[in-house]
Swiss-Prot record:
Note: Does not inhibit potassium channels (Kv), as well as metalloproteases, and cysteine proteases (papain and bromelain).
UniProt keywords, alphabetically: Disulfide bond, Nematocyst, Protease inhibitor, Secreted, Serine protease inhibitor
PANTHER family linked to this entry: BPTI_KUNITZ INHIBITOR DOMAIN-CONTAINING PROTEIN, KUNITZ-TYPE PROTEASE INHIBITOR-RELATED
Subcellular location: Secreted; Nematocyst
Tissue note: Expressed by acrorhagi.
SMART domains per the UniProt record, alphabetical: KU
Name of the protein this chain belongs to: PI-actitoxin-Aeq3c
Residues flagged as site, Reactive bond for trypsin: 17-18
Annotated Pfam families: Kunitz_BPTI
One GO CC annotation: nematocyst
Predominant location: secreted
Organism encoding this protein: Actinia equina (Beadlet anemone)
């Protein structure tokens, strides 16, 4: 398991309608994967780059 507990949270797009490419850690595949973030109400499993995601998770 990742050391950062936020990495275990589910991917969360959020209620806003922006379309920002972001990354989250998929605990099932054990990889950082891209998703489209809505721009607000994120959880701790939300990273601007794949590199940030890999460092954290």
């Amino acid at each position: 398991y990742p050391a950062n507990e936020g990495c275990l949270l589910p991917m969360k797009v959020g209620p806003c309608r922006a379309a920002w490419p972001s990354y989250y850690y998929n605990s099932k595949s054990e990889k950082c994967e891209e998703f489209t973030y809505g721009g607000c109400d994120a959880n701790a499993n939300n990273f601007q780059t794949e590199e940030e995601c890999k460092k954290a998770c």
